[in-house]
Curated annotation (Swiss-Prot):
Alphabetized GO MF terms: structural constituent of ribosome
SUBUNIT field: Part of the 50S ribosomal subunit. Contacts protein L32.
A Pfam family annotated for this UniProt entry: Ribosomal_L17
Organism lineage: Bacteria, Bacillati, Cyanobacteriota, Cyanophyceae, Acaryochloridales
The species this protein was found in: Acaryochloris marina (strain MBIC 11017)
Protein name: Large ribosomal subunit protein bL17
Cysteine pairs bridged by disulfides in the record: none
Keyword Ribonucleoprotein: yes
Keyword Ribosomal protein assigned: yes
Any one of the GO CC terms: cytosolic large ribosomal subunit
Keyword annotations: Ribonucleoprotein, Ribosomal protein
Length: 116
């Protein structure tokens, strides 16, 4: 039974939603900060936290799993190299969501998601 197993649907079919989250995750890891809608920021937060936890593990299986999710191979290697000294003592809470002003065109709630 799937009771209480919620997924952020984001108004998209499953394949488009997966591609959107992969793209946002890749850009967040690359740039450290991304401006997006509040719902997308909340959805991408769990994916990025999983990738950072995989990188903290550092095993070959974790690296291959991250390579299957993040679009850029060099970005995965850089993430695995620098994550131990950046997040080594922290158990979760690697991202921060900051609410900003609403988008002008459709008044959507916007947010900045950044790596701490």
């Amino acid at each position: 039974m799937r009771h209480r197993c919620r997924v952020h649907k984001l108004g998209k079919p499953a394949d488009q939603r997966k591609a959107l989250l992969r793209s946002l995750s890749t850009q967040l890891i690359r740039h450290g900060r991304v401006t997006t809608t509040k719902a997308r920021a909340k959805a991408v937060r769990s994916q990025v936290e999983k990738m950072i936890t995989l990188a903290k593990d550092g095993s070959l299986a974790s690296r291959r799993q991250a390579l299957g999710y993040i679009y850029d191979k060099q970005l995965v290697h850089a993430l695995f190299d620098q994550v131990a000294d950046r997040y080594g003592d922290r158990n979760g809470g690697y991202t921060r969501i900051i609410r900003t002003i609403r988008r002008r065109g459709d008044n959507a709630e916007m947010a900045i998601i950044e790596l701490t």
